Amino acid sequence: MATASSFDVVSDFDQQELVNAVDQARREITNRYDLKDSATTLELTAETLTINTDSEFSLDAVVTLLQTKVAKRNLSLKIFDFGKVETASGNRVRQVITLQRGLSSELAKDLSKQIRDQFKKVQVSIQGDALRVSAKSKDDLQTVIQYLKQQDVPAPLQFTNYR
């Protein structure tokens, strides 16, 4: 039992599920009576999602619709970092939503400090945009996972490479 066990804490999401959720939202926008004539567009790139519509009312409706579709696809709403609402050309409004992937360095340092303070038998190392948590006992690792699940973290956390 001298070997150390470990797991990684990452923050990621399934890109294909997000593509499917955005596609479902686009289809519902074309069918909904209150959004049919708004000429709303949803543009998804690897890092951002841009909503372009005719009024703030329809923007709020599209954001709510998008959040519903994303939640039904078992994606966390914490992946969205909403930018401010901008006025676009032709009396339109635009909102750019940044997609959060990976742990920021500040969040990784904060989580690392919390884990070290709470659990003395556990070692934590920051590896890029992930945390590696290791300990001799798998029970210690399980308690760390439970502790992190109870914390209110501004990013969705997944636990991978459990060995």
Curated annotation (Swiss-Prot):
Matches recorded under HAMAP family: YajQ
Family: Belongs to the YajQ family.
Annotated GO CC locations: cytosol
Keyword Cell wall biogenesis/degradation: no
PANTHER family: UPF0234 PROTEIN YAJQ
Molecular functions per Gene Ontology: nucleotide binding
Protein name: Nucleotide-binding protein Synpcc7942_0865
Keywords: Nucleotide-binding
CDD domains: YajQ_like (cd11740)
Function: Nucleotide-binding protein.
Source organism: Synechococcus elongatus (strain ATCC 33912 / PCC 7942 / FACHB-805) (Anacystis nidulans R2)
The keyword Nucleotide-binding appears for this protein: yes
